[in-house]
Amino acid sequence: MAELTISSDEIRSAIANYTSSYSAEASREEVGVVISAADGIAQVSGLPSVMANELLEFPSGVIGVAQNLDTDRIGVVVLGNYEILKEGDEVKRTGEVLSIPVGEKFLGRVINPLGQPIDGLGAIEAEEQRVLELQAPSVLQRQPVEEPMQTGIKAIDAMTPIGRGQRQLIIGDRKTGKTAVCIDTILNQKANWESGDKSKQVRCIYVAVGQKGSTIAAVRQTLEEHGALEYTTIVAAPASDSAGFKWLAPFAGAALGQHWMYQGNHVLVIYDDLTKQAEAYRAISLLLRRPPGREAYPGDVFYLHSRLLERAAKLSDDMGAGSMTALPIIETKANDVSAFIPTNVISITDGQVFLESDLFNQGVRPAINVGVSVSRVGGAAQTKGMKKVSGSLRLDLAAYRDLEAFATFASDLDAASKAQLDRGARLVELLKQAENAPQSVEHQIVSIWLAGNGHFDTVPVEDIRRFEFDLIDHLHAAVPQVFEQIAGGAQLSEESQAALVAATEDFKRTFQTTDGTPVINEPEVAALSADQVKKNTISVKK
């Protein structure tokens, strides 16, 4: 009988091979259960290790954001159709915080706050994912705002200038032209985009919060018709969306803008409007049973807007010198700028443009109240030429408003006051602009300089806008070198000023006013009296 031998090495090797190839089918996974779901909020039990703002996955692919982390339950903001959720549904952790895809291919597209396309043009190829709650640049990563962000609107570029990296609030009652001002600013970037110069190009993001779907479609159509959609992305959270989408939409726009800013590009982000975002956040907070404060807003509503708007910056040269300019819109009620949300955002931003319903109804459009509007960046964000010609414009208009109120009750005015009233009325008319018709900075400087120096004083008020439009065309043909000089960043030289005056006087001789009165002051010739005329007798020889 053969002797049985046992090799310990063979046994050890066999066990090692078996254990290395073995894979356990069981795995550990945290699972929660839906307790209730209503009004866009789900209460979930379980998930003891969940993080704040972590994404949670519900059945049917619906996702939510963990907000309230209580000891026995979690308050979740549902991003999607909450009506399909029911009690007892399983909830899983994803281990991820909310982020959106970003990239160059998002230009020209309409997306929702999750970065998903909603324009029916197919999927978008993303470069990377970017977290929505991204930290704003630190103090050392910034530099002062000094580059102008031209809006194409004379009243803003001259008196409340906006710089790249600035946060300028657009505030006013409903239907006063707030969105129109921002859309004109986007349209005015077309020439810079077509130049192909990265230092001039501005990528635009329009964030629509709580707007009607038809309004968002109209904005998209306007941008497309004017050739501005190719450098613009629309982030849409219409009124039909849940409060969660309206709350996150501005952060999605900021995340996309920061992606381009950190690449060294210039970005313009328009938040239309933050009042509706605050109302959506208030609704979420009340449904989550957080303690209400003033006007039922939660205590951190100031932080909601400050952490969003602080992400706008002009980066230092070491960081690539990119910029992100923010134009938040706030809607007031009865021109009350002292309400809770308006005062919050005014204190966060670097200035405000106040649009007044009374001016709008009087036909002054854009209806900018220059007395209340201010830019804390000021002349640092203006070209040299604009800074020089617009220096006295605000004072002239303020003096005109005071004198206009006084003249209502005064019967007689001296010649100087009457002249100031006449010029003020022409300046107000000059600052009016049609919608979707932004003007280049060269046109603005020439028009404001000529009007401020009295060259529009003889033009009837009702003809000012037509006179300006036709005059600019004439000056382009007569003195093109002046526009080239201004476009290069220089001030108006004495030679250029003389050339402008001469060309303007030539144009006045051919301009036809509505009532037929001449617009050039020809020297008056007094008629001779009868005794001054020497009578000669003419004799005719037959």
From Swiss-Prot:
Site, as annotated: Required for activity: 373
Cellular compartments annotated: Cell membrane
Superkingdom in the source lineage: Bacteria
CDD domains in UniProt: ATP-synt_F1_alpha_C (cd18113), ATP-synt_F1_alpha_N (cd18116), F1-ATPase_alpha_CD (cd01132)
Enzyme class: translocase
Enzyme Commission no: 7.1.2.2
Swiss-Prot/TrEMBL keywords: ATP synthesis, ATP-binding, Cell membrane, CF(1), Hydrogen ion transport, Ion transport, Membrane, Nucleotide-binding, Translocase, Transport
Binding site for ATP: 172-179
Pfam annotation, one family: ATP-synt_ab
InterPro entries cross-referenced by the UniProt entry: ATP_synth_asu-like_sf, ATP_synth_asu_C, ATP_synth_asu_C_sf, ATP_synth_F1_a_nt-bd_dom, ATP_synth_F1_asu, ATPase_a/bsu_AS, ATPase_F1/V1/A1_a/bsu_N, ATPase_F1/V1/A1_a/bsu_N_sf
NCBIfam families, alphabetized: atpA, PRK13343.1
Subunit details: F-type ATPases have 2 components, CF(1) - the catalytic core - and CF(0) - the membrane proton channel. CF(1) has five subunits: alpha(3), beta(3), gamma(1), delta(1), epsilon(1). CF(0) has three main subunits: a(1), b(2) and c(9-12). The alpha and beta chains form an alternating ring which encloses part of the gamma chain. CF(1) is attached to CF(0) by a central stalk formed by the gamma and epsilon chains, while a peripheral stalk is formed by the delta and b chains.
Family stated for the protein in its record: Belongs to the ATPase alpha/beta chains family.
The protein, known as: ATP synthase subunit alpha
Lineage: Bacteria, Bacillati, Actinomycetota, Actinomycetes, Mycobacteriales
